[in-house]
């Protein structure tokens, strides 16, 4: 049985993944969770885990202007913590470190200027969330390339779009409420990618099962 550690005790994606595994792969995976708040996690022993999934993040953006304190918080949570956790995973011989990044590293589009992403699209983050996640990706790649990685820990970076499902937060719930109360829904083409949380959970399960690496 593969042992998996989720970094982020209150993450929607992390909680959904744990529930999905319990319902579909209960005999194949043992999933634990830990919070990265404070310093206690640094004393934990991760050597027993096959994979560590980092879903800790500061995500929701409700304004267009950010203070220096807010920007620092994005960087501290989304980048610095991610890199510190990766170093711990490597040093303790974890087989695989999975980092949940975001499609926001490619920029934020709108109806007048959509951002179409394919394999050749270059990162161009436009807000503190996207910038901090991209900074984390760059930092993680340097860590895995430059420190010797004697234990051969594999790095996986996943860049999901907006994730929806039961109990999700963000804009999707607003759309659901609108659809329920509006008798006539406009015929408007959707240009935004969305991913059902169970599909993301299944993908992560396969990534762990096959010990994959890369973006």
Model-derived segments and their meaning:
Residues 83-128, 148, 156:
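Conserved Rossmann-fold NAD(P)-dependent oxidoreductase catalytic core, especially the SDR/UDP-sugar
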Residues 39-91, 105-108:
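NAD(P)H-binding glycine-rich loop region in Rossmannoid oxidoreductase-like domains
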Residues 73-81, 123, 127, 131-132, ...:
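Glycine-rich NAD(P)-binding loop of the Rossmann-fold in SDR/ketoreductase-type enzymes
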Residues 151, 163-174, 207-215:
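Glycine/proline-rich active-site loop of Rossmann-fold NAD(P)-dependent oxidoreductases
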Residues 3-22:
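N-terminal Rossmann NAD(P)H-binding glycine-rich loop of SDR-like oxidoreductase domains
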Residues 177-195, 206-207, 211:
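A conserved pocket-lining segment of Rossmann-fold NAD(P)-dependent short-chain dehydrogenase/reductase
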Residues 161-168, 187-198:
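Glycine-rich "substrate-gating" loop/helix at the edge of Rossmann-like oxidoreductase active sites
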Residues 138-166:
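Conserved beta-loop-beta element that borders a ligand/cofactor-binding pocket
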